[in-house]
């Protein structure tokens, strides 16, 4: 099977099965939770950071629920009037908003502080009018965001939030457990390493390797 046939098969799979599981177009979030992360760039960033060791719906509903508990969603107020311990306590309060409230409290408070000091309190300034490589580099500077998450963010920003990214060839596939298994079983790569999976995706779809994440997300 040629690369174009593999890509077409994945696109057909996404169209047939992917919509229901899409965090932004499926039924995993309430309308209010979905609208919040799609219209508020800071909520999107918080959801991205929270997407760790929990179900996707738990992570991406967290920003809305945290805002309800805070009574606001101002990055300046979080950075200057709260602490990582206070955020952790809010996350820990039953029903808990995350499996690891302590770590997540530190990550989210740190994100609010960085947004306030470097991006005028608005995450949209991270990805406005810059390349994919710059977006990834900026996102990786935030505690709790790995290269995998930063690559996933680029895909979601383009696919679901309508952010224009010119150099899509620099958006890598997310090194996700499901993708790794499929790539190995399909023989796209021989080893389960970041390097091998990334290079395989670049061979399969050189114009936009990160798109291959989409059918599984």
Language-model segment annotations:
Residues 1-75, 84-98, 104:
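Structure-specific DNA junction-binding interface
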Residues 54, 70, 119, 143, ...:
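A broad structural signal for alpha-helix termini and local helix breaks/kinks
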Residues 52-61, 115-121, 160-164, 187-191:
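Short helix-capping/linker segments at secondary-structure and domain boundaries
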Residues 1-39, 129-140, 147-217:
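C-terminal accessory module of base-excision DNA glycosylases/AP lyases that mediates lesion recognition
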Residues 43-54, 110-113, 155, 213-217:
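Short, hydrophobic/amphipathic alpha-helical patches that form generic packing surfaces
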Residues 69-158:
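Alpha-helical ds-nucleic-acid-binding substructure associated with the helix-hairpin-helix region
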Residues 46-51, 64-67, 88, 92, ...:
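Amphipathic alpha-helical segments within well-ordered protein domains
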């Amino acid at each position: 099977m040629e690369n174009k046939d593999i890509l077409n098969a994945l696109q057909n799979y996404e169209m047939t099965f992917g919509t229901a599981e899409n965090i932004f177009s499926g039924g995993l979030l309430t309308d209010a939770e979905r609208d919040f992360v799609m219209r508020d760039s800071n909520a999107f960033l918080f959801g991205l950071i929270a997407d760790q060791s929990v179900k996707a719906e738990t992570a991406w509903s967290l920003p809305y629920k945290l805002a309800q508990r805070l009574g606001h969603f101002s990055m300046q107020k979080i950075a200057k009037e709260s602490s990582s311990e206070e955020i952790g306590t809010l996350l820990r309060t039953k029903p808990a908003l995350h499996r690891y409230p302590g770590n997540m409290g530190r990550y989210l408070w740190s994100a609010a502080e960085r947004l306030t000091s470097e991006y005028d309190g608005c995450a949209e300034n991270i990805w406005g009018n810059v390349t994919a490589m710059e977006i990834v580099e900026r996102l990786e500077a935030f505690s709790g965001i790995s290269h995998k998450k930063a690559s996933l963010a680029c895909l979601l920003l383009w696919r679901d939030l309508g952010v224009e990214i010119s150099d899509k060839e620099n958006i890598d596939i997310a090194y996700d457990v499901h993708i790794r298994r499929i790539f190995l079983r399909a023989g796209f790569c021989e080893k389960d390493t970041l390097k091998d999976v990334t290079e395989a995706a670049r061979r399969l779809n050189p114009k936009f390797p990160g798109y291959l994440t989409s059918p599984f997300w």
